[in-house]
């Protein structure tokens, strides 16, 4: 009985190591997607509104998003124009700017429609990535997710924003090899 228990525990530890490696490999993709998305939106809105502090454009942001920026600025005690505020805002802020509420004020100014299959699909996929990011960041279980789909979404969205960067990230990625290894182990998860 002790032998079975130790074998069972060994299998559990092995799966935990595989999934932690997959999470680490996915984090590289998430990192590049997050910085690419925030830089892309920030740059486009700076150009559109001809100001570094585009969030102060009257009527642009909802009260919630505006207060989120104000909290970040107050907490950081910085001069908002001398610092890149975009680096302090969470991915959830940038994904919120892709919602239907911001269709005219943000989405149309990003000029992404010709590059992707619409705001709704882009937002849906970005929201899936946000959920995956939060699971990984909080050391939660990811084995029940469709990780192949998540990996594809990361590649697709990053390629829309910066095709060259997406190719470089994919060239160095270990995600698919790790996912294949996890499948061979027969984890029974959502891979």
Protein language model annotation of sequence segments:
Residues 1-191:
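Amphipathic alpha-helical interface elements
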């Amino acid at each position: 009985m002790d032998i079975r228990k130790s074998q069972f525990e060994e299998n559990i530890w092995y799966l935990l190591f595989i999934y932690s490696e997959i999470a680490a490999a996915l984090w590289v993709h998430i990192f590049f997607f997050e910085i690419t998305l925030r830089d892309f939106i920030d740059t486009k809105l700076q150009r559109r509104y001809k100001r570094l502090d585009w969030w102060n454009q009257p009527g642009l942001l909802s009260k919630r998003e505006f207060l989120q920026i104000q909290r970040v600025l107050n907490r950081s005690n910085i001069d908002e124009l001398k610092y890149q505020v975009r680096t302090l805002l969470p991915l959830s802020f940038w994904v919120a700017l892709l919602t239907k509420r911001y269709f005219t004020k943000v989405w149309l100014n990003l000029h992404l429609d010709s590059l992707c299959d619409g705001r709704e699909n882009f937002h849906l996929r970005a929201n899936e990535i946000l959920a995956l990011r939060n699971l990984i960041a909080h050391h939660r279980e990811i084995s029940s997710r469709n990780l192949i789909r998540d990996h594809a979404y990361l590649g697709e969205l990053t390629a829309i924003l910066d095709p060259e960067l997406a190719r470089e990230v994919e060239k160095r990625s270990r995600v698919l090899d790790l996912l294949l290894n996890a499948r061979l182990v027969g984890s029974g998860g959502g891979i």
